[in-house]
Amino acid sequence: MPKATYFRLPAEKRHRLMDAAVQEFTRAPFAKASVSNIIQTAGIPRGSFYQYFEDKQDIFFFMLQDLGKDLGKGLLEHLETAHGDLIAGLRDFMDDLLDQVVTGTHADLFRNVFVYMDYHSAARTMYGDAKPDHHDKKKLAMSKLLPLIDHDKITIDNDHDIIMLIRVAFTWFMQVLAGYYSAKNTDHEVPIDDVKTSVATVLDWLEHGVAK
Protein backbone atom coordinates (compact mmCIF):
# COMPACT_ATOMS: atom_id res chain seq x y z
CA MET A 1 0.00 0.00 0.00
CA PRO A 2 1.13 3.56 -0.62
CA LYS A 3 2.58 5.51 2.27
CA ALA A 4 0.46 8.19 3.97
CA THR A 5 2.30 10.90 2.01
CA TYR A 6 0.78 9.61 -1.23
CA PHE A 7 -2.77 10.14 0.00
CA ARG A 8 -1.91 13.70 1.02
CA LEU A 9 -0.95 14.59 -2.56
CA PRO A 10 -3.30 16.70 -4.67
CA ALA A 11 -5.68 14.54 -6.69
CA GLU A 12 -4.12 15.68 -9.98
CA LYS A 13 -0.67 14.47 -8.92
CA ARG A 14 -2.00 11.13 -7.66
CA HIS A 15 -3.83 10.55 -10.95
CA ARG A 16 -0.72 11.52 -12.92
CA LEU A 17 1.37 9.00 -11.00
CA MET A 18 -1.20 6.23 -11.48
CA ASP A 19 -1.50 7.04 -15.18
CA ALA A 20 2.29 6.79 -15.47
CA ALA A 21 2.25 3.40 -13.74
CA VAL A 22 -0.49 2.12 -16.07
CA GLN A 23 1.49 3.33 -19.08
CA GLU A 24 4.69 1.62 -17.92
CA PHE A 25 3.15 -1.72 -16.93
CA THR A 26 1.24 -1.71 -20.21
CA ARG A 27 4.50 -1.14 -22.09
CA ALA A 28 6.37 -3.95 -20.34
CA PRO A 29 5.77 -6.89 -18.00
CA PHE A 30 6.54 -6.37 -14.33
CA ALA A 31 10.09 -7.74 -14.47
CA LYS A 32 11.05 -5.35 -17.27
CA ALA A 33 9.10 -2.31 -16.13
CA SER A 34 11.11 0.56 -14.71
CA VAL A 35 10.55 2.94 -11.82
CA SER A 36 12.71 5.40 -13.77
CA ASN A 37 10.19 5.42 -16.61
CA ILE A 38 7.30 5.88 -14.19
CA ILE A 39 8.83 8.91 -12.49
CA GLN A 40 9.93 10.41 -15.81
CA THR A 41 6.41 10.09 -17.25
CA ALA A 42 4.84 11.40 -14.04
CA GLY A 43 7.34 14.25 -13.83
CA ILE A 44 8.43 13.66 -10.24
CA PRO A 45 11.89 13.23 -8.62
CA ARG A 46 13.06 9.69 -7.77
CA GLY A 47 13.25 10.64 -4.09
CA SER A 48 9.60 11.67 -4.12
CA PHE A 49 8.55 8.29 -5.53
CA TYR A 50 10.01 6.48 -2.52
CA GLN A 51 8.21 8.87 -0.21
CA TYR A 52 4.97 7.54 -1.71
CA PHE A 53 5.74 3.87 -2.39
CA GLU A 54 8.11 1.26 -1.02
CA ASP A 55 9.15 -0.05 -4.43
CA LYS A 56 7.98 -1.08 -7.90
CA GLN A 57 5.90 -3.95 -6.53
CA ASP A 58 4.08 -1.60 -4.17
CA ILE A 59 2.86 0.71 -6.92
CA PHE A 60 2.12 -2.28 -9.20
CA PHE A 61 -0.34 -3.89 -6.79
CA PHE A 62 -1.89 -0.58 -5.81
CA MET A 63 -2.40 0.23 -9.50
CA LEU A 64 -4.21 -3.11 -9.99
CA GLN A 65 -6.31 -2.51 -6.89
CA ASP A 66 -7.21 0.95 -8.18
CA LEU A 67 -8.23 -0.43 -11.59
CA GLY A 68 -10.12 -3.25 -9.91
CA LYS A 69 -12.46 -0.85 -8.14
CA ASP A 70 -14.39 -0.11 -11.32
CA LEU A 71 -14.35 -3.74 -12.44
CA GLY A 72 -15.60 -4.87 -9.04
CA LYS A 73 -18.58 -2.54 -9.14
CA GLY A 74 -19.86 -4.56 -12.06
CA LEU A 75 -20.45 -7.61 -9.88
CA LEU A 76 -22.79 -5.65 -7.62
CA GLU A 77 -24.67 -4.33 -10.65
CA HIS A 78 -25.01 -7.77 -12.24
CA LEU A 79 -26.14 -9.30 -8.96
CA GLU A 80 -28.83 -6.66 -8.59
CA THR A 81 -29.96 -7.26 -12.18
CA ALA A 82 -30.13 -11.00 -11.45
CA HIS A 83 -32.37 -10.27 -8.43
CA GLY A 84 -29.89 -11.79 -6.00
CA ASP A 85 -29.23 -14.97 -7.96
CA LEU A 86 -25.53 -15.44 -7.15
CA ILE A 87 -24.63 -17.86 -9.95
CA ALA A 88 -26.56 -15.92 -12.59
CA GLY A 89 -24.91 -12.70 -11.41
CA LEU A 90 -21.45 -14.29 -11.52
CA ARG A 91 -22.12 -15.72 -14.97
CA ASP A 92 -23.15 -12.37 -16.47
CA PHE A 93 -20.40 -10.49 -14.65
CA MET A 94 -17.62 -12.84 -15.76
CA ASP A 95 -18.86 -12.80 -19.34
CA ASP A 96 -18.75 -9.01 -19.30
CA LEU A 97 -15.42 -8.96 -17.45
CA LEU A 98 -13.77 -11.19 -20.05
CA ASP A 99 -14.73 -8.69 -22.75
CA GLN A 100 -13.34 -5.80 -20.73
CA VAL A 101 -10.09 -7.54 -19.85
CA VAL A 102 -9.40 -9.01 -23.29
CA THR A 103 -10.59 -6.20 -25.57
CA GLY A 104 -11.08 -3.18 -23.30
CA THR A 105 -9.01 -0.06 -22.71
CA HIS A 106 -6.44 -1.87 -20.56
CA ALA A 107 -6.26 -5.10 -22.57
CA ASP A 108 -2.47 -4.90 -23.07
CA LEU A 109 -1.93 -4.21 -19.39
CA PHE A 110 -3.98 -7.23 -18.32
CA ARG A 111 -2.13 -9.39 -20.80
CA ASN A 112 1.15 -8.45 -19.11
CA VAL A 113 -0.36 -9.09 -15.71
CA PHE A 114 -1.71 -12.56 -16.43
CA VAL A 115 1.18 -13.81 -18.57
CA TYR A 116 3.98 -12.73 -16.27
CA MET A 117 2.43 -12.80 -12.81
CA ASP A 118 2.61 -16.05 -10.86
CA TYR A 119 -0.47 -17.56 -9.21
CA HIS A 120 0.47 -16.33 -5.72
CA SER A 121 0.67 -12.77 -7.01
CA ALA A 122 -2.60 -13.16 -8.85
CA ALA A 123 -4.29 -14.36 -5.68
CA ARG A 124 -2.89 -11.39 -3.81
CA THR A 125 -4.32 -9.07 -6.43
CA MET A 126 -7.77 -10.62 -6.08
CA TYR A 127 -8.00 -11.17 -2.34
CA GLY A 128 -5.51 -8.67 -0.94
CA ASP A 129 -2.49 -9.45 1.21
CA ALA A 130 -2.13 -9.80 4.97
CA LYS A 131 -1.88 -6.07 5.59
CA PRO A 132 -4.82 -4.76 7.67
CA ASP A 133 -5.74 -2.06 5.16
CA HIS A 134 -6.14 -4.57 2.33
CA HIS A 135 -8.05 -6.93 4.59
CA ASP A 136 -10.43 -4.20 5.71
CA LYS A 137 -11.15 -3.17 2.11
CA LYS A 138 -11.97 -6.73 1.16
CA LYS A 139 -14.34 -6.96 4.13
CA LEU A 140 -15.99 -3.72 3.00
CA ALA A 141 -16.46 -5.06 -0.53
CA MET A 142 -18.05 -8.25 0.78
CA SER A 143 -20.24 -6.29 3.17
CA LYS A 144 -21.82 -4.60 0.13
CA LEU A 145 -22.11 -7.84 -1.85
CA LEU A 146 -23.51 -10.28 0.70
CA PRO A 147 -26.80 -8.45 1.44
CA LEU A 148 -27.68 -8.55 -2.28
CA ILE A 149 -27.59 -12.36 -2.44
CA ASP A 150 -30.93 -14.20 -2.37
CA HIS A 151 -30.31 -17.09 0.04
CA ASP A 152 -33.43 -18.85 -1.18
CA LYS A 153 -31.62 -19.52 -4.48
CA ILE A 154 -28.60 -21.30 -2.97
CA THR A 155 -28.16 -24.14 -0.49
CA ILE A 156 -25.39 -22.35 1.42
CA ASP A 157 -26.70 -20.70 4.56
CA ASN A 158 -23.73 -18.77 5.95
CA ASP A 159 -21.56 -15.89 4.74
CA HIS A 160 -18.26 -17.72 5.24
CA ASP A 161 -19.20 -20.46 2.79
CA ILE A 162 -20.67 -17.98 0.30
CA ILE A 163 -17.37 -16.09 0.27
CA MET A 164 -15.53 -19.37 -0.22
CA LEU A 165 -17.79 -20.21 -3.18
CA ILE A 166 -17.14 -16.82 -4.77
CA ARG A 167 -13.40 -17.34 -4.34
CA VAL A 168 -13.60 -20.77 -5.96
CA ALA A 169 -15.39 -19.23 -8.94
CA PHE A 170 -12.87 -16.41 -9.29
CA THR A 171 -9.89 -18.71 -8.84
CA TRP A 172 -11.09 -20.78 -11.78
CA PHE A 173 -11.82 -17.59 -13.75
CA MET A 174 -8.25 -16.40 -13.27
CA GLN A 175 -6.79 -19.78 -14.17
CA VAL A 176 -8.79 -19.88 -17.40
CA LEU A 177 -7.77 -16.32 -18.25
CA ALA A 178 -4.11 -17.05 -17.50
CA GLY A 179 -4.35 -20.07 -19.81
CA TYR A 180 -5.86 -17.91 -22.54
CA TYR A 181 -2.98 -15.42 -22.35
CA SER A 182 -0.39 -18.17 -22.13
CA ALA A 183 -1.72 -19.72 -25.33
CA LYS A 184 -1.90 -16.31 -27.01
CA ASN A 185 1.73 -15.71 -26.12
CA THR A 186 2.77 -18.86 -28.00
CA ASP A 187 0.68 -18.06 -31.10
CA HIS A 188 -1.90 -20.74 -30.26
CA GLU A 189 -4.69 -18.32 -29.56
CA VAL A 190 -7.89 -19.70 -28.07
CA PRO A 191 -11.11 -18.02 -29.28
CA ILE A 192 -12.59 -15.86 -26.54
CA ASP A 193 -15.91 -17.68 -26.96
CA ASP A 194 -14.15 -20.91 -25.91
CA VAL A 195 -12.83 -19.15 -22.82
CA LYS A 196 -16.32 -17.96 -21.97
CA THR A 197 -17.63 -21.50 -22.43
CA SER A 198 -15.01 -22.86 -20.00
CA VAL A 199 -15.98 -20.31 -17.36
CA ALA A 200 -19.71 -20.96 -17.89
CA THR A 201 -19.17 -24.73 -17.61
CA VAL A 202 -17.56 -24.44 -14.19
CA LEU A 203 -20.34 -22.15 -13.01
CA ASP A 204 -22.81 -24.80 -14.22
CA TRP A 205 -20.94 -27.38 -12.12
CA LEU A 206 -21.17 -25.08 -9.10
CA GLU A 207 -24.86 -24.50 -9.71
CA HIS A 208 -26.00 -28.05 -10.49
CA GLY A 209 -23.21 -30.29 -9.20
CA VAL A 210 -21.51 -33.07 -11.14
CA ALA A 211 -22.53 -36.24 -9.28
CA LYS A 212 -25.29 -38.45 -10.73
Feature roles, as predicted:
Residues 1-9:
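N-terminal intrinsically disordered/low-complexity leader segments
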Residues 10, 14-22, 56:
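Short, leucine-enriched amphipathic alpha-helices that occur as contiguous helical runs
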Residues 16, 27-58, 62, 66:
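Helix-turn-helix
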Residues 20-23, 27, 41, 58-81, ...:
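Alpha-helical structural segments
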Residues 84, 88, 111, 120-156, ...:
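Amphipathic alpha-helical packing segments from all-alpha helical-bundle domains
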Residues 84-107, 167, 196, 200-207:
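Amphipathic alpha-helical segments that line or abut small-molecule/effector binding pockets
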Residues 92, 100-128, 132, 140-143, ...:
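Amphipathic alpha-helical segments used for helix-helix packing
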Residues 143, 147, 151, 167, ...:
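C-terminal peripheral helix-coil segments that are non-catalytic and often amphipathic
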